[in-house]
Amino acid sequence: MTLAEVLERIDRERPGESTEEEKLRWLSQVDGQWYREMVLTHEGAEETTFAPYTTDGDKSVALLIAPPYDEVYIHFLYMQIDQRLGEIDRYNNDAALYNQGMLEARQAYNREHMPLQGSRLRNIFPIYNPTRDSNNPLA
């Protein structure tokens, strides 16, 4: 899905409820998070770039989350609009759809892209040895 397709769909389905600047900021949040948490932590990151979307930027650019998971963009924008309008029930429905879509997109990305090997967690705390503890009466 391209940036222009998302903007056109939101304008058609929810006309006048948000400005283009707001929609671009929200889309930048989604793709920025995806880029940091998914793309940069997996092999092949050098093939993908991301810069926040602007009103004077190219609207034909493809968004980072590929089909069939790209509906997350629509649900995220609906979520933001509903939150601002105080439509809590609609917000909750859109949030559930967004979260489910992101979960499925992350799972698919993890299946298709190998995580970077240098990103393992390391134990930075020393191992406790009770025989070396001078305050331990059993030592």
Residue ranges and their predicted role:
Residues I81-Y91:
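Short helix-capping/linker segments at secondary-structure and domain boundaries
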Residues N92-R106:
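Short secondary-structure subsegments characteristic of cysteine-rich extracellular domains
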